[in-house]
């Protein structure tokens, strides 16, 4: 079902700031036109929402691929294969994420992504690029190919920004590397989100990076200097510094439930951003897949390189939301913060992350068990599930 104008009746509208029950929501021309009780309108398609909840569409700030597609493929159809898969899990917007590779490969990916940002009618929207690698630590490389890891270089970043049409919104880097702190400051001043990740920084180096503008931690706990009582490391810095938002991959593989609970208690919902870090095997059968020229084995235990290193995930955003609720018993309002609102704030979006009149009509309808029933993008029902 595809609507140009839609009213959802008698639904509970949930935002980060609270909820309103038994509301009608009128979506028109891609925007939220009105939220009120008993909206009267003629010639408008209607959807009954009794007993269900309307949440802002999920925003995934860290996703490499799905359905055999990867951002680094630099193909014409790549993002247009990816978009229809992510929207099925309630993700209405995302950052296409890269990984460490040769500069030539990066050049192609930046150029191709910059040319393919207009979504088709059944796709999630690409908000921009998240550059993960090559400016990371070889000591914390994980699945990032060692041969292509280099020191942060602002001239290279400026070239990529130009090739992408100024679409780079976030960069993961290791600030302790040579030129790292200068890059943190320069990027932050230019409006790019600096996320500390794949980093062996000390706690003190972490604090310095935050003072220079770093505001996020890439997939907390994974491939970062761990906590020690004499050196809290990057993990300690992400957990303790309020100015840092923590990305979490809540798939029961990348971290223990207790580690998720600890992050929730220390950061609170205001300090957490749920991500998938998904790779091309998402939405595909178990088997062998490629990640940056490396063989990845995908099983029920996750995605791993031959050496055992985790290589992204096959997590979906709706499952991440359910997992977070299961572990922490957090409220729906808190889930909105962690799945959309915080990401929108980080990206300085003034049209997403909230269900408010004038905002984009991007939303999901879920039941009391957080099972997805509909995904709405630009006021149209793009996905209707059998839940």
Curated annotation (Swiss-Prot):
Amino acids binding a divalent metal cation 1: 62, 64, 132, 277
Enzyme class: hydrolase
Reaction catalysis annotation: N-acetyl-D-glucosamine 6-phosphate + H2O = D-glucosamine 6-phosphate + acetate
Positions of substrate binding: 143-144, 222-223, 230, 251-254, 310-312
GO biological process, one term: N-acetylneuraminate catabolic process
Residues holding a divalent metal cation 2: 132, 198, 219
Active site (catalytic residues): 277
The protein's annotated pathway: Amino-sugar metabolism; N-acetylneuraminate degradation; D-fructose 6-phosphate from N-acetylneuraminate: step 4/5
Keywords carried by this UniProt record: Carbohydrate metabolism, Hydrolase, Metal-binding
Hydrolase as UniProt keyword: yes
MF terms in GO: iron ion binding; N-acetylglucosamine-6-phosphate deacetylase activity; protein homodimerization activity
Residues of the signal peptide: none
Task of the protein: Involved in the first committed step in the biosynthesis of amino-sugar-nucleotides. Catalyzes the hydrolysis of the N-acetyl group of N-acetylglucosamine-6-phosphate (GlcNAc-6-P) to yield glucosamine 6-phosphate and acetate.
Family named by the database record: Belongs to the metallo-dependent hydrolases superfamily. NagA family.
Protein name: N-acetylglucosamine-6-phosphate deacetylase
Organism: Lysinibacillus sphaericus
Taxonomic classification: Bacteria, Bacillati, Bacillota, Bacilli, Bacillales
Gene that this sequence comes from: nagA
